[in-house]
């Protein structure tokens, strides 16, 4: 047992990455992979079973808990943004250096790409059998929607853009409130569960129009995978070239969320007064000295 532990420790030292930003990028990649793998896996079950193994609620629950798990995995290493819109907001507020925006975005997109690949491999036979050995993007036998978001038939481009804008702005406002130490902060260790709850609420209230991507990496990574895996370029042209909306709109929504929170809450918060416990300690100390 001692030799085995020594060997494990030695291997760990050899594999240890000393460049902090690279360690953080790997954490973002894995966290986003977990998010997409569990989230898209729930969509796959619903679509491929034609609704017999879940529904809209189970998809939202899966994405909410997937976000929680992703944050628990990556949180202590990278902050677990798992979303370029969140990274953009943190850089915009000068809470993170701007160099992290391209690095995190690339890592998050790669993680989403790999997560989609895992689900494709897991449900490979079911996907091919679903539409008689065809990979169809949209329609009753479409399977591309397992991986990326597409607009509903009633949705035009302007309404769809607004949908993603509001969804992301809402997400950013809630995230900023959760991580703000001066605004009734969430107890340590519960941040991941609270953010997961936010995603669940957004999904159950704003998911009808286009599936609430509110995350450029979560949408583009799997979309790119489907284009390579066999669905082809149609994944970029369907829905009047919808693919760019879940990329651009969330970034603009991120800025809006930052301004709304800062203008209405963040700029007006004051540091909490010293705790009564500290005051009591000081007062008791003074009395003790006077008695002496």
UniProtKB/Swiss-Prot annotation:
Motif (NPA 1): 83-85
Subcellular location: Cell membrane; Basolateral cell membrane
Pfam families, alphabetized: MIP
Principal localisation: membrane
One annotated GO molecular function: polyol transmembrane transporter activity
Keyword Ion transport applies: no
KW Lipoprotein (keyword) present: no
Any single biological process term in GO: polyol transmembrane transport
Reaction it catalyzes: glycerol(in) = glycerol(out); H2O(in) = H2O(out); urea(in) = urea(out); H2O2(out) = H2O2(in)
Intramembrane residues: 79-92, 211-224
Disulfide bridge positions per record: none
Topology in membrane: Multi-pass membrane protein
Transmembrane domains' residue ranges: 25-42, 57-74, 101-121, 160-177, 190-206, 243-264
Residue spans, topological domain Extracellular: 43-56, 122-159, 207-210, 225-242
Motif annotated as NPA 2, chain positions: 215-217
Segments in the Cytoplasmic topological domain: 1-24, 75-78, 93-100, 178-189, 265-292
Annotated site, Selectivity filter, chain positions: 63, 212, 218
Subunit note: Homotetramer; each monomer provides an independent glycerol/water pore. Could also exist in other oligomeric states.
Domain note: Aquaporins contain two tandem repeats each containing three membrane-spanning domains and a pore-forming loop with the signature motif Asn-Pro-Ala (NPA).
Record function comment: Aquaglyceroporins form homotetrameric transmembrane channels, with each monomer independently mediating glycerol and water transport across the plasma membrane along their osmotic gradient. Could also be permeable to urea. Also participates in cell permeability to H2O2 and H2O2-mediated signaling. In skin, transports glycerol to the epidermis and stratum corneum, where it maintains hydration, elasticity, and supports lipid biosynthesis for barrier repair. In kidney, contributes to the reabsorption of water, helping the body maintain proper fluid balance.
Protein name: Aquaporin-3
Species of the source: Bos taurus (Bovine)
Species classification: Eukaryota, Metazoa, Chordata, Craniata, Vertebrata
């Amino acid at each position: 047992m001692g030799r085995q532990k020594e060997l494990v420790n030695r291997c760990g030292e050899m594999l240890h990455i000393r460049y902090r930003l690279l360690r953080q990028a790997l954490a973002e990649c894995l966290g986003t992979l977990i998010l997409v793998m569990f989230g898209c896996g729930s969509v796959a079950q619903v679509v491929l079973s034609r609704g017999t193994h879940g529904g809209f609620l189970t998809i939202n629950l899966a994405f909410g808990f997937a976000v929680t798990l992703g944050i628990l995995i990556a949180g202590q290493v990278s902050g677990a943004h798992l979303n370029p819109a969140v990274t953009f907001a943190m850089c915009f507020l000068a809470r993170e250096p701007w160099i992290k925006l391209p690095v995190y975005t690339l890592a998050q997109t790669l993680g989403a790409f790999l997560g989609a690949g895992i689900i494709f491999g897991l449900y490979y036979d079911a996907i091919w059998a679903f539409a008689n050995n065809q990979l169809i993007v949209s329609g009753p036998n479409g399977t591309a929607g397992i991986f990326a978001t597409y607009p509903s038939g009633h949705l035009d481009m302007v309404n769809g853009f607004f949908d993603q804008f509001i969804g992301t702005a809402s997400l950013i406002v809630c995230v900023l409130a959760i991580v703000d130490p001066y605004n009734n902060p969430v107890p340590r260790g519960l941040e991941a569960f609270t953010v997961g709850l936010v995603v669940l609420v957004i999904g159950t209230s704003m998911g009808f129009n286009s599936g609430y991507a509110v995350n450029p990496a979560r949408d583009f990574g799997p979309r790119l995978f489907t284009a390579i895996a066999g669905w082809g370029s149609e994944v970029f042209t369907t829905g009047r070239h919808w693919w760019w909306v879940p990329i651009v709109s969330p970034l603009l929504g991120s800025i809006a969320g930052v301004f709304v929170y800062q203008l209405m809450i963040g700029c007006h918060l004051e540091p909490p007064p010293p705790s009564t416990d500290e005051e009591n300690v000081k007062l008791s100390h003074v009395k003790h000295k006077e008695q002496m």
